């Protein structure tokens, strides 16, 4: 395929969040965050499991109080995905969740107290092999930086991040990743570009408070797409005012569109016009709903007529080109004799897609030099 792998990743160090490798060429991890009350253990566990089901690699949980820390202990015991504890101000909460098996601490060392408290948290993280995420946000910059720069700027976010990085450097702790998020696309992008030149640690990408499901997805795709295309980024979160499950789906869609990492089916579908021989939109929507559980990476083209249908099918694992009453079917770009009745497309396509996905998932790669 044209330009199969055009992106050269920024070199970075390697850390582990639980069993998930981050940086140094590891697959870019997709993260989300719960929006339940952490003290509601049942609701939080249910949401984390829903995120696990759609492929979330890491889930962040806010832990604002000691009661939440005790709830975190119960939550951690009931889920498989690595958990990041989001903590501000009270260093004792960080120490407590470390006891309970947290996989990563999201803290800013400079806002959890004096040097003794910072050292206590860092020493605990070191002893238990827990990485730290430094999280700088354009909406919560330090007062002196706002006085200096008058408003959030890339330089202000960079300076804030480097303050926290310097603290960890002085304590000889290098197992961390950093984010410099902002709600403005250009502010976030330039901040990450500056930071990428300053440190070797992994970077966690995000456009913070991006908005609702539609606008937030677009804003995140634009901002993160710019950075990812430049090779910047090792983990990401799509921040939406929506169900966190949608954050994970959008995250994978962005990675999929850049051919960085694929999970599940990439539907190539026409917007439809008067040439369509079947209802493309309802067909695609129903297939997406039915096939959410398929994790095999594959391209499926569904085109409503023969103008572009055969061409798209040529570069898809499976393809459909609309025809009068019956539509043409392609497998690995090859036209099949079998044709599908336009009144029964969804059932027929679902069966073919599931069979193809199973075949691809179980395919044994041929080693170079193997005989036929």
UniProtKB/Swiss-Prot annotation:
GO terms for biological process: isopentenyl diphosphate biosynthetic process, methylerythritol 4-phosphate pathway; terpenoid biosynthetic process. The keyword 4Fe-4S applies. Its cofactor is [4Fe-4S] cluster. GO terms for molecular function: 4 iron, 4 sulfur cluster binding; 4-hydroxy-3-methylbut-2-en-1-yl diphosphate synthase activity (ferredoxin); 4-hydroxy-3-methylbut-2-enyl-diphosphate synthase activity (flavodoxin); iron ion binding. [4Fe-4S] cluster binds at residues 270, 273, 305, 312. Pfam families: GcpE. Pathway: Isoprenoid biosynthesis; isopentenyl diphosphate biosynthesis via DXP pathway; isopentenyl diphosphate from 1-deoxy-D-xylulose 5-phosphate: step 5/6. Binds 1 [4Fe-4S] cluster. It catalyses: (2E)-4-hydroxy-3-methylbut-2-enyl diphosphate + oxidized [flavodoxin] + H2O + 2 H(+) = 2-C-methyl-D-erythritol 2,4-cyclic diphosphate + reduced [flavodoxin]. Keywords: 4Fe-4S, Iron, Iron-sulfur, Isoprene biosynthesis, Metal-binding, Oxidoreductase. InterPro entries: Dihydropteroate_synth-like_sf (IPR011005), IspG_bac (IPR016425), IspG_bac-typ (IPR004588), NO2/SO3_Rdtase_4Fe4S_sf (IPR045854). Its EC number is 1.17.7.3. It comes from the Bacteria. NCBIfam families: ispG_gcpE, PRK00366.1. Converts 2C-methyl-D-erythritol 2,4-cyclodiphosphate (ME-2,4cPP) into 1-hydroxy-2-methyl-2-(E)-butenyl 4-diphosphate. This is 4-hydroxy-3-methylbut-2-en-1-yl diphosphate synthase (flavodoxin). The gene is ispG.
């Amino acid at each position: 395929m044209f330009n199969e792998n055009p992106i050269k990743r920024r070199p970075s160090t390697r850390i582990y969040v639980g069993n998930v490798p981050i940086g140094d060429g590891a697959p870019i991890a997709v993260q989300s965050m719960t929006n339940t009350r952490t003290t509601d253990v049942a609701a939080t566990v249910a949401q984390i499991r829903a995120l696990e089901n759609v492929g979330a690699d890491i889930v962040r949980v806010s832990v604002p109080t000691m009661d939440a820390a005790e709830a975190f202990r119960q939550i951690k015991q009931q889920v498989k995905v690595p958990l990041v504890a989001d903590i501000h101000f009270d260093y004792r909460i960080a120490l407590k969740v470390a006891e309970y098996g947290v996989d990563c601490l999201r803290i800013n060392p400079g806002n959890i107290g004096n040097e003794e408290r910072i050292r206590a948290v860092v020493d605990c993280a070191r002893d238990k092999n827990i990485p730290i995420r430094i999280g700088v946000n354009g909406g919560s910059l330090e007062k002196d930086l706002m006085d200096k720069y008058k408003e959030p700027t890339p330089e202000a976010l960079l300076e804030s991040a480097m303050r926290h990085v310097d603290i960890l450097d002085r304590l000889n702790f290098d197992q961390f990743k950093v984010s410099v998020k902002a709600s403005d696309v250009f502010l976030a992008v330039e901040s990450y570009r500056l930071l990428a030149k300053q440190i070797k640690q992994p970077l966690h990408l995000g456009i913070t408070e991006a908005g609702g499901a539609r606008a937030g997805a677009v804003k995140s795709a634009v901002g993160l797409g710019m950075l990812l295309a430049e090779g910047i980024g090792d983990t990401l979160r799509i921040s939406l005012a929506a169900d966190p499950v949608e954050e994970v789906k959008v995250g994978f869609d962005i990675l999929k569109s850049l051919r960085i990492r694929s999970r599940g089916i990439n539907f190539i579908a026409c917007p439809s016009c008067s040439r369509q021989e079947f209802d493309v939109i309802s067909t695609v929507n129903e297939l997406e709903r039915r096939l959410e559980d398929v994790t095999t990476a594959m391209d499926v083209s569904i085109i409503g007529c023969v103008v572009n249908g055969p061409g798209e099918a040529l570069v898809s694992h499976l393809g459909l080109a609309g025809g009068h009453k019956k539509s043409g079917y392609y497998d690995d770009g090859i036209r099949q004799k079998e044709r599908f009745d336009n009144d029964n497309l969804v059932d027929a396509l679902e069966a073919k897609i599931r069979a193809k996905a199973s075949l691809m998932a179980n395919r044994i790669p041929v080693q170079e030099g193997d005989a036929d």
